[in-house]
Amino acid sequence: GESFGVLELCKILGIRQSALSHHLKILAKAKIVSTRKEGNSIFYRRALLKEDDPYREIKESILEHVDKIPMPDDIKRQIKNIQVERAERSLSFFRKNADKFQIKQGLIVEHTDYASSLHDVIASLNIHDESQIVEVGPGEGELLAELTRKFKNLLALDNSQEMLEKCKNTISSGKCEGVKFMLGDTSIALAKNIKSDLLILNMVLHHIPTPAKTFRDASSLLNRGGHLLIVDLGRHDQDWVRDSCGDIWLGFEEADLNDWGSKVNLEVGQSSYLSLRNGFQIQMRVFTKTINPK
C-alpha cells in the first residue's frame, strides 16, 4: 500500500496528532505498520509480513478483514486530496524547472551512466519491433529517441506540458519517427484504453505521489506477458534531492517494488544494479504480467 506522513494521516482520519501517534506506536510495535524516514518526515505504511513472523497468519487474517470493510466516502475524499497535493507539488517543480531539469537530474545521475546497461536489459526481453512501447515521464526524450532505432510504435506519456514539449523537441530535432505524445498520467492512459507490451518508468517513480497505484495502473495497461521496466534509485538518505530535483521519495527498497508488483499480477523478473561514484545506486527491475493471474 501507499505511505502517508503523520500529518497526512491526521487529515485523512480527522484525528489529533497526539492521539494518532499513540495508535501508530502500538501498530508499529506489533509490526502491523512499518516506518520509513523521508528527510525530516516519517512515513507509515502497512508492514510487509515476514515468513518467520510467529503471528503472520493472525496478522494476515486481520488485514484481510480490514480490507473488506468499506472505506467511508469522506476518508476516500481526504486521501484523494493528499494525492492531488503531492502531485501538484511535483508538477509545480517541473513547471518551474523544465529548462534546468536535465542539469538538476545530472546531480544524481546522467543518462549515459547507465544507458548501455538499460538497453541490454530491454534487448534481453526479446520484444518485437512493432510492439507498443510506452514511456511514462520521458523527460527530454533521450531514451525514446534511442528506442526509435529499434521500435516503430512508441508513446510518450507525461503530465507536465513543459516536459512533454521538451521531449517533442528532442524527437523532432533528431528526425525520429514512430513516437506519439499524450499529456497525462497512467490514469489518463487507462481512460483512453492504451495497451502496452513494454511500459518504462526511467528515473520517474520517485517523482510520483502514489507509486503503489502506479503499479496497479501498469498492470492494467500491460498486455498479458507484457513487461514493466522500472529504473530508479535504491533507498538513500540524500534529502537535498527533494528541493534540487523535485523528488518525492528517497529511492525504493527492492522489497517494496516486489510487494507492489506481486499484488497486481506482476511477476518479478531480472534485476540489475549499478553503483555510482556519488553513492547512489541505480536499480533496473523487470516485472512481467502473468499469463494466468492469481
Label for each model-derived stretch:
Residues 132-134, 138-188:
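Class I SAM-dependent methyltransferase SAM/SAH-binding core
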Residues 213-227:
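A short glycine-rich, Lys/Arg-flanked "PGG" loop and its adjoining helix->strand segment in the class I
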